[in-house]
Curated annotation (Swiss-Prot):
Gene3D superfamilies noted in UniProt: Mitochondrial carrier domain
GO function term, MF aspect, one: GDP binding
Ranges of the Solcar repeats in the UniProt entry: 11-106, 114-203, 212-297
Organism for this UniProt entry: Bos taurus (Bovine)
Residues in compartment: Mitochondrial intermembrane: 1-16, 104-119, 200-217, 295-309
Domain-related comment: The GDP-binding domain is located within the hydrophilic cavity, with GDP phosphates likely forming salt bridges with the charged residues, Lys-141 and Arg-185.
UniProt main location, coarse: mitochondrion
Protein name: Dicarboxylate carrier UCP2
Length: 309
């Protein structure tokens, strides 16, 4: 057995809720530079045609993007928007991941045998609900990560200022910009991520290929990360472009997607795929492994507290 041993008592909803948020924050701390590189690649060339964009591309590849940012903006630029990112994960992952099992049990009426339909429904529900809670933090995070593209001056100087400026200049709706594509994205991401993780893990355990410990969690998380990136990349690119856009640049998320297709072609929807996969794959591994261990550690601590002397 590698890591904390599974406890006889299943983790409570509170343990899952807090564990998911904490694990997601740890994963974000480790993988945030990859997410920033992904955002820069996704918004690159959005106001140019495909030929002009290719000729004038500032960022080329994951490593090239990171090195260019470090050289031109300094190492701290890789973590621009981290505060909003951690705020987002604590509120976002707690809901979409921490409540997944509870919602799944609700849809199956407490049965331990959940079909794919129930899992997909639970993933869609918690993914959409999480967006409703955390959308403003996502808007601020994306804008901080992208703001070097906005010109010589920085768009926002601090996280608090960003919230205030967006609310003042764009109204309440500005903080919820991109909610529609984000709901779609996170319903898809949650289904792909959590359901794939669930299914891979169940298959490995039922086939006795692995035991319920770190190697199993690592393999399941990595597979889930790849599947999620393939499925969710097009919606993710539209979400990033739309949330980062200036007031009036796009009339809707659909208009943003149509403009991308007309100006840059279908390949634009997979811009930043490699950093997306590297980020989501590594994020999934760190998050799920940490989450599984946190659940066990918290339940073990609770059991030791309640044990008689």
């Amino acid at each position: 057995m590698v890591g904390f041993k599974a406890t006889d008592v299943p983790p409570t909803a509170t343990v899952k809720f807090l564990g998911a948020g904490t694990a997601a924050c740890i994963a974000d701390l480790i993988t945030f530079p990859l997410d920033t590189a992904k955002v820069r690649l996704q918004i690159q060339g959005e106001r140019q045609g495909p030929m002009q964009a290719a000729a004038s591309a500032q960022y080329r590849g994951v490593l090239g993007t990171i090195l260019t940012m470090v050289r031109t903006e300094g190492p701290r630029s890789l973590y621009s928007g981290l505060v909003a990112g951690l705020q987002r994960q604590m509120s976002f992952a707690s809901v979409r991941i921490g409540l997944y099992d509870s919602v799944k049990q609700f849809y199956t009426k407490g049965s331990e045998h959940a079909g794919i339909g129930s899992r997909l429904l639970a993933g869609s529900t918690t993914g959409a609900l999480a967006v409703a809670v955390a959308q403003p933090t996502d808007v601020v995070k994306v804008r901080f990560q992208a703001q070097a593209r906005a010109g010589a001056g920085r768009r926002y100087q601090s996280t608090v200022e960003a919230y205030k400026t967006i609310a003042r200049e764009e109204g309440f709706r500005g903080l919820w910009k991109g909610t529609s594509p984000n709901v779609a994205r996170n319903a898809i991401v949650n289904c792909a991520e959590l359901v794939t993780y669930d299914l891979i893990k169940d298959t490995l355990l039922k086939a006795h290929l692995m035991t319920d410990d770190l190697p199993c969690h690592f393999t399941s998380a990595f597979g889930a990360g790849f599947c999620t990136t393939v499925i969710a990349s097009p919606v993710d690119v539209v979400k990033t472009r739309y949330m980062n856009s200036a007031l009036g640049q796009y009339s809707s998320a659909g208009h943003c997607a149509l403009t991308m297709l007309q100006k840059e072609g279908p390949q634009a929807f997979y811009k930043g795929f490699m950093p997306s996969f590297l980020r989501l794959g590594s994020w999934n591994v760190v998050m799920f492994v940490t989450y599984e261990q946190l659940k066990r550690a918290l339940m073990a601590a609770r059991a030791s507290r309640e044990a008689p002397f």
